[in-house]
């Protein structure tokens, strides 16, 4: 509204204004005098005075808590317009379809689809690529200054793909690759040697390869076509590579040396040992393989000294810190490798020993050692630990001290004493029988067994010259050996005549207690 008013002129000047009222739609010509606080309105068309009212200022209008319906509707319309503008702005950055061309009914036209990148999605993608690519000007659009910050992916008339794009494959010609799944642990760097057939020489080269694929086993190319390679399940992927020394690499910390036959070790005993020693010379990070497996296929029988060759390989594996696994078929060898690959990331809790706590009745380490001896239970182990201060005193005690403990009878004392005093390695004992007579005696040992109850020597006849010992039972419990040679005939139960008859009944008693 425009008005002109002069303070010096007493006669007010009138101006003609056109005002539109949204409620009553009445147009009037008013002569208005505007002040900051009060406003006076006069109507020039009619001489009738009107009711005087005060027009509130902008600050007073904002202080009012209740607004009129007109103001509310205007604000809602303004918000809708802002939202529509923001939506149109995002639609311009989304997938745009060109309109169909108007053709006749006989011809068919297909829409030309042009995919354009979305700024909100590209901001979240951090893909490291080695090659330099040129970015399109649409990929870096200015930020959207609108109240709606949710990204608009595609209009309602565009059909989204039913299945997602495969991993590590580009979505379109102008978009980068999708980020691959996280792999744990990371890639493994190693230096391998490659063989050149033209120059007949080896050359070392550093290659970075990720051995942590979920279902992939890296095999030596020499294993191609073997029966074991055809025995893996369909879930395992075999990738052949030029590995000179290890035959298989299961992951970044597990490698396998495979001996396909014991006959190879029999003909060349140093072959597998030289291959294992050559591993550290070609692979810079060979120490990172914490699990090293020596897989052996035993194809020899017992008559061909199969056990002897396995013992030799076991000593080689212990010296070189390898784990020896013996299989009896190539299918079984494939199952072992597949099991190692399948249970690679599994926790070892199912195969760990679950020791019961001592508070709940479990055994301590000292009790486990003592109860490993036969006839010693947990109560006896507790008694020994209470009466002796250290384990050294327990293993150096005497029979008299053990017999004083509660629960230790003569038999238990003797068994425990024999166990803690016997050597770790026993040599086969050769016993000979001698007599005081001038005639030589022939002894034939048929069966030797250890018995803790009785000592029996059974002879076939009563002749002291030819005694055949059929059963010898050694006892260390109650009886002692009589070393007096004069009582030899009496100990045999004889009467001095050499017939073995002690009571004169004509029968020979062939029993001796030593």
Swiss-Prot record:
Residues 1-52, 426-514 are annotated as: Disordered. One of its GO terms (biological process) is nucleotide-excision repair. It holds the Pfam family Rad10. It comes from the Eukaryota. It is found in: Nucleus. One of its GO terms (molecular function) is single-stranded DNA endodeoxyribonuclease activity. Keywords: DNA damage, DNA repair, DNA-binding, Endonuclease, Hydrolase, Nuclease, Nucleus. Its main location: nucleus. Belongs to the ERCC1/RAD10/SWI10 family. PANTHER family: DNA EXCISION REPAIR PROTEIN ERCC-1, EXCISION REPAIR CROSS-COMPLEMENTING 1 ERCC1. Structure-specific DNA repair endonuclease responsible for the 5'-incision during DNA repair. Heterodimer composed of ercc1 and xpf/errc4. This is DNA excision repair protein ERCC-1. It comes from Dictyostelium discoideum (Social amoeba).
